[in-house]
């Protein structure tokens, strides 16, 4: 009897834990909405969601949280007549949800659903706070995104790395671009434009990226973190004695330099940056 009770308690704990990201999503859409749904996660090698009915509650079933969230969006749109928009992520659900008359299933063989590019982060997201990012991550899940680019805080990594390499704050500020231009900086097109950034900026960005990654991983979304392209400050040869090439100007902007082989730094610096 004790064994059976223990198993039941463990199963209940798993169910509660599995449902929590979706519960949070539903509560952000409409307070109290999570009590109107039954959320079920089942194992499957195929990404899918199902809509079903149990008594007066709508069942949304899927193989992972992103699939289930996509099912939530499908139900709201096609059964409840609710259209969530990019600028309107809340709604008032009916007191009694429209029933699902027969089980409906949707699946995809598209394993990876990618989102964003570097320009998006500067055009649109440069000054987003956590409140706005929380909505965006919900939006991703509702639309089946599971592989978004996640570059918030790349400037923090570079700030820390260059500090370790002996660069002064003024020198670092001449290299790292301002928020609205970091997309082009990270694509090796310019240095320092739109800066300098205040010290508080880097602290905020580090905290924000940790919040973003935590929420993405709660959903099962896999963030795409930036790798290392060989970019270094334009003065890395004089400042650090590195073997670099000068790519010239981009639309009149001075570009960062590129590390060139042979140099032991070409293998050590990427590891150093990624670990930061």
Task: List the predicted regions and their residue ranges.
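Sec-dependent N-terminal signal peptides
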Residues: 3-13
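Composition- and surface-driven signal marking solvent-exposed, interaction-prone regions
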Residues: 4-6, 74, 227
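Acidic, contiguous N-terminal accessory segments
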Residues: 9, 16-69, 74, 95-104
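Aromatic-lined carbohydrate-binding surfaces of glycoside hydrolases
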Residues: 41-45, 54-65, 79-80, 90-91, ...
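Short, structured interface segments
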Residues: 72, 79-100
């Amino acid at each position: 009897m004790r064994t059976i009770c223990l198993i039941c308690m463990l199963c209940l704990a798993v169910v509660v834990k599995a449902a929590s990201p979706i519960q949070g999503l539903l509560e952000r859409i409409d307070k109290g909405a999570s009590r109107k749904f039954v959320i079920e996660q089942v194992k499957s090698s195929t990404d899918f969601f199902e809509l079903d009915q149990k008594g007066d509650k709508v069942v949304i079933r899927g193989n992972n949280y992103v699939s289930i969230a996509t099912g939530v969006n499908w139900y709201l749109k096609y059964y409840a007549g609710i259209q969530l928009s990019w600028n309107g992520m809340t709604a008032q659900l009916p007191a009694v949800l429209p029933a699902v008359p027969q089980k409906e299933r949707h699946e995809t063989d598209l394993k990876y659903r990618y989102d964003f590019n570097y320009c998006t982060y500067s055009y649109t997201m440069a000054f987003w706070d956590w409140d706005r990012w929380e909505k965006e991550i919900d939006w991703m899940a509702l639309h089946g995104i599971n592989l978004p680019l996640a570059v918030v805080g790349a400037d923090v990594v570079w700030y820390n790395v260059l500090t370790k390499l002996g660069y002064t704050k003024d020198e670092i500020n001449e290299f790292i671009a301002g928020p609205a231009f970091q997309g082009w900086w990270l694509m090796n097109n310019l240095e320092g434009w739109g800066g300098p950034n205040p010290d508080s900026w880097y602290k905020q960005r580090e905290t924000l990226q940790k919040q973003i990654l935590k929420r993405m991983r709660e959903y099962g979304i896999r963030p795409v973190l930036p790798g290392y392209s060989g970019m270094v400050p334009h003065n890395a040869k004089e400042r650090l004695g590195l073997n670099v090439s000068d790519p010239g100007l981009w639309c009149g902007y001075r570009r960062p330099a590129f590390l060139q082989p042979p140099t032991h730094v070409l293998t050590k610096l990427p590891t150093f940056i990624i670990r930061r």
